[in-house]
């Protein structure tokens, strides 16, 4: 029967081009098309494809949100993000949502076909630019973890209080230390984390899971 595939993209010309090309592949069968996030969620349920080619920016739910919902209900459906965007703000959330592949629309047709086959067989397929973003994020996380390890227990406590939006006076009261001591800790925290102000410190704490987003 071959690979059953659905294309999700809000641009008809993109869907038409993909359908035209994929028809030349004897082992791939396009069984549906969707133009929005809500539509692809419904089609995935109804048609139970082997794989979805998912655009990121669509009306209603975007591709990342749609991927998350589809994977939650049908984890065996494979999803390749096919988009024009390769920035970290798109790549990382897409992979975290459960996407099995991430390709750009400038990909060579033969490479896309190879990606489809690899992903259906249980593999992963990432465009080199997407791989670069993942490696960059991993490297950044390791560097931030190392910076956190440099903080003393008390400095971590102060950082958490900063992330909660407390003033130096409030932090002093919470931790039973003087306001002057708090100021010293804040200066040390900013220096060790290589940050310029309290706002950046608060964002750092939230981003690294030291405190829940307030």
Which residues make up each language-model segment?
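Active-site residues of response regulator receiver
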Residues: 9, 55, 83
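Acidic catalytic/metal-coordinating carboxylates
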Residues: 36-39, 62-65
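Short hydrophobic/Thr-rich beta-strand motif most characteristic of the beta2 strand and flanking loop
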Residues: 27-35, 43, 195
């Amino acid at each position: 029967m071959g690979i059953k595939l659905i294309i999700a993209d809000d641009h008809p010309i993109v869907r038409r081009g993909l359908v035209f090309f994929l028809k030349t592949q004897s082992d791939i069968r396009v069984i549906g098309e969707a133009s929005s996030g809500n539509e692809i969620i419904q089609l995935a349920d109804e048609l139970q494809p082997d794989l979805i080619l998912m655009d990121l920016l669509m009306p209603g739910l975007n591709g990342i949100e749609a991927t998350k919902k589809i994977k939650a209900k049908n984890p065996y459906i494979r999803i390749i993000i096919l988009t024009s965007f390769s920035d970290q703000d798109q790549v990382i959330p897409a992979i975290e949502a459960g996407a099995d592949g991430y390709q750009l629309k400038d990909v060579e047709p033969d490479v896309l076909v190879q990606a489809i086959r690899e992903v259906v067989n249980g593999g992963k397929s990432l465009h080199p630019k997407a791989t670069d973003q993942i490696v960059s994020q991993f490297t950044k996380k390791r560097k931030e973890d190392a910076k956190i390890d440099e903080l003393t227990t008390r400095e971590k406590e102060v950082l958490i209080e900063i992330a909660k939006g407390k003033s130096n006076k409030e932090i002093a009261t919470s931790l039973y230390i003087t306001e002057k001591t708090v100021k010293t800790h804040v200066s040390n925290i900013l220096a060790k984390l290589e940050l310029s102000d309290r706002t950046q410190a608060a964002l750092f704490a939230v981003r690294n899971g030291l405190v829940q987003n307030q």
